Amino acid sequence: MSQLCPCGSAVEYSLCCHPYVSGEKVAPDPEHLMRSRYCAFVMQDADYLIKTWHPSCGAAALRAELMTGFAHTEWLGLTVFEHCWQDADNIGFVSFVARFTEGGKTGAIIERSRFLKENGQWYYIDGTRPQFGRNDPCPCGSGKKFKKCCGQ
């Protein structure tokens, strides 16, 4: 039986992010890399996360922290609401909401991730967390106020 990809694409995992996470293919752009990294969090694949972090970030030192997070976090869904990059610039950005439960509480990560392309491969560098007012529209596109949606 086929399994839908956790990235929210509505495509089978084997045809969507699995080829990137397994190393069969290299993510062709920042959005695919971000979606496949989300899948790696869901699938608890620290190796892929470390491999796709830019080498300057020293991600290998985060392995223990990743493993601890895997044990306590259940990922509930991903919504990408903005992405932009230009291959000529070798830099790209993807904005998303990732929903999760941890310790019985539901939460969300809202981030604008920055990616860098080197030697034909995209890498995650870092992300910023935009601030939203409680009465602002939720960036996930639900049409609800932030406080009634991802800001809970």
From Swiss-Prot:
Top-level taxon: Bacteria
Disulfide bonds: none
InterPro entries, per database record: NTF2-like_dom_sf, SEC_C_motif, UPF0225, YchJ-like_M
One Pfam family named in its UniProt record: YchJ_M-like
Family, per entry: Belongs to the UPF0225 family.
NCBIfam families reported in the protein's UniProt record: PRK01617.1, PRK01752.1
Protein name: UPF0225 protein YchJ
Species for this entry: Shigella flexneri
Lineage: Bacteria, Pseudomonadati, Pseudomonadota, Gammaproteobacteria, Enterobacterales
Gene that produces this protein: ychJ
